Amino acid sequence: MSAMRRCTCFIICLLTSYTYGTTELVEYTRGDIEFDSSNGEKIIDISTTKGIRCEWKVSSDYYTACFKWKFIWDQVDKYEVAGFSGQITVNYTTDSEGQKTRTVKVNLTDPGGEIWYNVSRSRYLSTYYASYNYTLEPQKRHMEAMELDKYFAPVDDRDAVLIVEGKKLHVSSCFLSFHSTYFHDLFEYDNSTSLLNIEIPVEGVSYEDLGLLLSVVHSTATFPNDGNSKKLLELASQFQTPYVLGLVENHLLTNTFAWNETLMLLADKYGLMRLLGKSIRRIDSIEKARQLKDSVFLELSDSAKVKVAYHMIQLL
C-alpha cells in the first residue's frame, strides 16, 4: 500500500467522542446484579453513554458495602462542557427492610471523579442484590456577564458613541480605529463633523456581544477564556480586529481544555497559523493519526488538508 493510501486510511478512522447539545441529558439504567460479600473491591458494571464511561465498583464484607461510581469523561469536549450534575438512584436489598432506594447527588468537575455511597447491615448477609440508574446534565461553559454600562460610560477620552440595540457604548474612536479596520472605516465615514456626542448605529451584532469584544480591546474587564473564545473569534473576524484574534490564539496555545481537533478547526477557520501548526504537530504518532476524525479532516480548508496529509506521511 502506498504512503498516501495508508495516510488516507488513517484520516478516515473515527475517534469515539461526544459534543453535547444545549439541553441534552445523559441517562443510563442497570438492572439487578448479584454479587457476594467477599472482601476486596471489584468492578461489577461498566457502561459508556454519550462519551461518559461509568465504572460501578463495590467494596464489601459481610456487614457493609460501599458502592462507587467512577465517571470517566475524557472523550467529552471540555472546551464546551465544564462538568456534569444530576443524580444516581440506587436500589439494594437489606436484611431487615427488604429493598431500599436511595438518591445520591452528583456534581462532576473532574474527568475521573468518583461518587461513593455506603450501605450498612445489622447482620451477616453473604449475597447482595443491587441496581442503579443515573441522569446527568452537562454544565456548559458560559461567558461571564459584564456590567457594560459601567465599563463603557462616558469619560473624557471617549469621543464616540456606538448605538447597539438602542443602548450606548462610549468608546475612543482613535483607539478603536487603531485596532479595527471596521471601526476605522466607520469613523472615517463620519468624520465630516466632530465625533463628539455623535451617535453611530452598529448593526448585525447584539449589545452584549459587541460589549464583549470591546472589553477585550480595551482590556477593561475581560480576557479570552474557554467560555468566550469561540465567540471572540467570530466577533474579531466580523469586526476585523486582529489584536483580539492574537489574544485568543495565545489563550488557545497555552491554557485551554479544548480537544486538538477543535483547535485545528478553529485555527484553520480564523487563520491562526501558530495554533494550526501546533495542532498538526500534536499528531505525533500513527495511533494519533488513526484517531483523527474523518469529519474534522473534511471540514478543513484545502491548504490545511495538505499540511495535515504531509505531516502524516512523515510519520510513516
UniProtKB/Swiss-Prot annotation:
* GO CC annotation terms, alphabetical: extracellular region
Record's keyword terms, sorted: Glycoprotein, Secreted, Signal
Tell me where in this chain the BTB domain is found. Answer: 158-226
Subcellular location per UniProt equals: Secreted
Q: Which Pfam families match?
A: BTB (PF00651)
Q: Which residues are glycosylated?
A: N91, N107, N118, N133, N191, N260
Annotated signal peptide: 1-21
Under the heading PROSITE patterns, the entry gives:
BTB
Protein name, as recorded: BTB/POZ domain-containing protein Y57A10B.3
Organism (species): Caenorhabditis elegans
